[in-house]
């Protein structure tokens, strides 16, 4: 039984940040009911290709993007623009511990589904709103997108190659880091609010903003700036204070070499057949290497190109030089450590084939998270939830379908 098996979550979110929070809670055992638009559902259901393939190898209508953030949930289709749909959500909220939503600021108020309205039917409700810029401030009513937030929040100013070198300029992260981190911070906030509720009986409203999270994620870069007044700059895959501490291209791929001291530098160049570099006064110490970075790094780059990725990893690991490969995802899921940790899971799907997903990375001895059910088909649980939770009979459900309220 999961640690959160006593918790029910009403998930009114779409795309990534909110669904990521809901999926995390579901992994730990929470009963998550995902509210979706009839006939369309979560936008990400259609964000393909690639799509999940059925037992015959043909594409289904389930986009891989949607599959990433929606396992362990029940899907209920409700049109919240209709009075009947609004009533359904209110009745479900009255039987839930948590409501998650990521609508624009104020949008749910016109439907009577904002925090104040739902608190009236469930006084101890934990209600988490996820938006781009939060419920207050001059940007509150702007739409928030991860890419834009990475720029506004400073992440891209410190990510990417240095200006003035080939490929220089700001870069976004390869995944939606602001969305994902907001999902995780939202999970933490929900759990803290539930702990407070359990002690006091008091619910509360949680106001999560992608921009707030993105700014917070810069961590020591923030404090470096706040202490010095000097904005940090991009260093690409290099380190501003340590050389060599960066990526290098081998004859068949890329590796990371993270030399942390002068002894490791000597071992690195000895492994590469260039021991004289360690005795060169320009490179003998780290401060000297930092000063002569632009001279040293091209020499090392030519040295590294002479061997394969595997040959370098074997040689440097044997010499005690910190290093690692830069793997593509095919290599990641074939990696012996990733395999040993069971990071890939397969769950049966109604399409007749298994859906391959990535397991929750948390390991717990008593209440581990679990991937129990595949991401649901659109509306797969509508009838069951209305019947079992709300007591609707078949005639009432049929009438709601005729009105396109569900």
Predicted segments — roles?
Residues 243-319, 323:
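Aromatic-enriched alpha-helical interface/lid elements that frame and gate functional surfaces
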Residues 318-372:
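A glycine-rich dinucleotide-binding beta-alpha-beta segment and adjacent secondary-structure elements
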Residues 163-164, 183-204, 216-227, 269-276:
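Oxidoreductase and adenylate-handling cofactor-binding alpha/beta cores
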Residues 1-189, 193-199, 377, 383-406:
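N-terminal helix-loop segment corresponding to the beta1-alpha1 unit
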Residues 39, 133-134, 210-217, 252-254, ...:
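Glycine-rich beta-alpha junction loops
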Residues 135, 165-177, 198-214, 233-240, ...:
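Conserved Rossmann-fold dehydrogenase catalytic segment
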